[in-house]
Amino acid sequence: MSEGERDDTDRLIADFLGTGEEPTPADHRSGYVAVVGKPNVGKSTLVNALVGHKVAIISPKPQTTRRRILGILTRPDAQVLFLDTPGVHEPKQALHRYMMREVDAALKDCDAVLFVTDVSRLPNDEDRRVAQRIARLSQPKFLAMNKADLLDPRDVIEHVAAHEALLAPASQEGRGAMGGAPRASEAGSRESVEPAGSIFNPQFSMLTSGTRGDNLDKLLSMLLATLPYGPRYFPPGQTTDQNERFLAAEFVREQALRFLEQEVPHGIAVTIEDWQTRPNGMIYIAATIYVERESQKGILIGKGGDMLKKIGANARKEIERELGAKVYLELWAKVRPGWRRDDALVARFLEGNS
């Protein structure tokens, strides 16, 4: 099949799926970008900022993201499909293994890789493991040194050099950033000049801030330049492929992460039990929050039910904002001992709202 015939086929597929009101131009680009990094480096905040809509919940607590989350950015000249992924870590139980399979699936399916680090801190072995994990991939790779808004100006040179040293060939580690290659600046980027054999070897690296929006337009331009020519796969205005039940469950979990402390948030799962649109247009949602121990259930409910009410009230506002409708949210607390260690329960809790 010639290139022209392939383009025609792509357009026919997109039209059949109903993904556009008009044919996409011949120079239209589209593709998947896997967003990867260790936990708590701001991947979800960055994806939300790039998409321009909240498609993934955020929390300062690590391991907030448990599944691949698709964020769709549509422009006249391109459609970028960001795959927000769980933070890469050593799997110790069934939940962690599930999360790492989600990372591997995103890397397998993507057209480009965006490696995200937290430049406000010096890199550690977790960052190096992520770099090594993606080194074997043939797709174009980019480094986003994120959380630049939290970077102390006195630390810029040291921290940028340390993060770019993640990319240095093994034989040059310890010599400084890139073995003497030019460093990224706060205002711009640089093309990679690493020799063959680098651990990571990206096309570009850049300081970014998902919270403040630093350099996101430039980062996006770099990503777009490497994506293949192709059709629009989702209609304009659609920002994710996640359904409303999944999003509602995630908003409940986000508020639980926000208000609960210590180990309780890590053992939480949320399932939607009932969803009804009532004659007056109000949406009734019943959800169950699962924890692993009775003591955690008591903390989740709170004195006189205060904690559960607080989580519900804040989650309801997020759900109403997303749905554009009034919501009556009813929450229940239940105990499911050791669910994070049970493959079947992990799959049920993480996929049951899809």
Predicted features and spans:
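Residue-level signature of catalytic and energy-coupling elements of molecular machines
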Residues: 36, 40, 46, 69, ...
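Conserved G1/Walker A P-loop phosphate-binding module
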Residues: 2-101, 105-107
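G-domain G4 guanine-recognition motif of GTPases
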Residues: 85, 117-120, 142-156, 206-214, ...
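Conserved C-terminal guanine-recognition region of P-loop GTPase G domains, centered on the G4
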Residues: 77, 100-171, 200-204, 278-279
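Canonical P-loop GTPase G-domain recognition
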Residues: 140, 149-186, 190-240
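Conserved, well-folded catalytic cores of nucleic-acid-processing
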Residues: 53, 72-76, 91, 106-113, ...
